[in-house]
């Protein structure tokens, strides 16, 4: 059987270990012409294999657009992270990726809690709520996110998805393993169903509100007692935020200051 026959899907392995995925899609009937950087090469001569990296995403988005593909998939080095590219070359990573897989999960498991790391957007929280789920924004670090999902289930709260903005995703149905290939496969199955209906994945997250601006800044802590220095910085930021009219500190909050 060839369930993906008629679909054109590009794989970008970034010269990491994800090249095998193209062979699987091809065997299932997909047209994979335009797939790139499938052979492992630890020098990573084309771009860093990272679904968060702007250069990497720009490369695969361009490949999808130029090949007129229906979908694109990009993996990190060891295939525990992935992201999707839509029909017109639009990137579906970070908040958009979480929104898309959350939509799939909430269709299958209405009311599920979705655990994420701490840097997800307010727009994502609204999207999950509108889909009937509960957004549990936790700490950064894929182990923190996954372990929190496991803990909630053990406490009697249904959680079927734990995911970081980096693309680390763990599903309860897959024993909470952080498996980028499993995430990609689940989204491709969903995309194939939409394809038969004449729809595209980006339509599913059209209502997701995107941040006006999003930028990550990493500040070096120079004091040998870096924990104390970091804690002092958070205290100072909190004092500053409390003094600004119209600003509200989010509670509950499990990491940093929001």
Model-derived segments and spans:
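N-terminal small/polar loop signature for handling phosphorylated ligands or for N-terminal nucleophile
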Residues: 26-85
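Phosphate-binding and adjacent anionic-ligand microenvironments
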Residues: 71, 109-258
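Short acidic, glycine/serine/threonine-rich loops at helix termini
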Residues: 20-24, 45-48, 82-88, 124-130, ...
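Gly/Ser-rich phosphate-binding catalytic loop and adjacent alpha/beta segment
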Residues: 1-43
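Short hydrophobic/aromatic-enriched beta-strand-loop microsegments
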Residues: 31-37, 91-96, 132-140
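Gly/Ser/Thr-rich loops at beta-strand to alpha-helix junctions
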Residues: 14-19, 79-80, 120-122, 167
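Short beta-strand segments
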Residues: 12, 74-76, 162-163
